[in-house]
């Protein structure tokens, strides 16, 4: 018997298995192909808007994704630097093959982890408690808990034009059959979603004189808090071209053979990552769309055509690609395709990712209706932490919306109606100024340390940084900038004359002012600050905390109000039907979702503020 069995070794499964085994428990990771561990089946990249923040949070909690991309990245960029700090998001292109090799090596190094090449086709449970899993080989493996991270494999069906093939992630990988049906028999509700991927081309066939080069940053910050620097790393460029009206006309000639428009695809696709044919259909007035050409690694000629996700017939794909600048002679390596797959609407899970119907069974990743490697990895890590915590009799990790993007992700899953693949955006987080990529360690590392996934040394580095931030803030409070120095600085910004000096903590709030400018203008202040810490991340956080102090205080007040509702627990078998005053829709949604707290209940679609007022009175009794 294993403590925990993990089904699937994608981005969710690898993080789940590592979290369990590093907690000191025995774990079995079952996957159809051990050479496809953490495979990047779509874009060869980690991070991006909101996703970069999630990757940093995974690292702070003790996950592996950030270390993996630091080790195998081929281009690193910080996005949205022209916007405020809440929007700054790290992103990296990955060497796809090297990333898989890194993750497989990480799994193989874990002494508590066994790997098995097989397929989970069913679960065994007795009286609502998980007992084990059934494998395609016919074997029964018993376990105290199981985490299902099946990705797009559940009854996967791939579409290219009017042709369709059973496939789990690519045409070469078989789907998982039987598991969906097994779970439905156990009382779960399943649905159908769709996603897609662009074609891959031979980068030697691109005319680089006709496309725009996009280089990486010279000194990008690492994703992992344990990576000292990425300075001097070899990087590859990406390139930008555009679709044209001619491209769109060519692609339209294939719409009568498109599975999207002929009704062959039944699953609902991601709203914010539409196919090129969907973009043409939805935005007919747009003469063109950005297309990004992204290399897939140092040792391959494959290039990913970002922005050209499609399931049109292969001949139409080739003609469409060759109508764009720089791609006139392009060679196709792999056609783009759409894939339909089963998922389980996530109102059926708790915020710990344990299912409500079967104890000790957890769902993580695309089985919950999410899209994206980072969203999947975050869920896998959380499920692994909580499965281990339950066995070890530790408190479960429940992240609030004000704690982390991961908290927002899980709360949205368990409270909102899932009608399409869920993708995280900064706009999804009402506390996004608090949930920046740079402070993920301060927000979350203590949780990872309590779970046994973050070392004492890493936790001490975080505490040292926190102490330095506090001491530097105190220094800015007691150090004043003389009027003549301040006047000289602000006159360069075209600001009114300064009649008197100011504390540095106040002066830094002025437009165009920065900690670096103030340090360079006041040598004694610079010397005192550097004697506290030379950590540039600590300096950056001090500047952000001081500049946005008023906004951060408002976010904290909002978070406190929400926390009061989240502190009011609702019994799991609460009888909503007998409460007078609740709307009929409210009763229906409360019964199906079974919220854990009044705060969760308030965020369920269809539960009105008046319903919450009625509940508050009854629960308060």
UniProtKB/Swiss-Prot annotation:
It is found in: Cytoplasm. One of its GO terms (biological process) is tRNA wobble uridine modification. Its cofactor is FAD. InterPro entries: FAD/NAD-bd_sf, GIDA_C_N, MnmG, MnmG-rel, MnmG-rel_CS, MnmG_C, MnmG_C_subdom, MnmG_C_subdom_sf. GO terms for cellular component: cytosol. It holds the Pfam family GIDA. Residues 200-218 have a biased composition (Basic and acidic residues). NAD(+) binds at residues 269-283. FAD binds at residues 8-13. Its main location: cytoplasm. It comes from the Bacteria. Keywords: Cytoplasm, FAD, Flavoprotein, NAD, tRNA processing. Residues 199-227 are annotated as: Disordered. The keyword tRNA processing applies. One of its GO terms (molecular function) is flavin adenine dinucleotide binding. Belongs to the MnmG family. NAD-binding protein involved in the addition of a carboxymethylaminomethyl (cmnm) group at the wobble position (U34) of certain tRNAs, forming tRNA-cmnm(5)s(2)U34. NCBIfam families: mnmG_gidA (TIGR00136). Homodimer. Heterotetramer of two MnmE and two MnmG subunits. PANTHER family: GLUCOSE INHIBITED DIVISION PROTEIN A, PROTEIN MTO1 HOMOLOG, MITOCHONDRIAL. This is tRNA uridine 5-carboxymethylaminomethyl modification enzyme MnmG. It comes from Chlorobium luteolum (strain DSM 273 / BCRC 81028 / 2530) (Pelodictyon luteolum). The gene is mnmG.
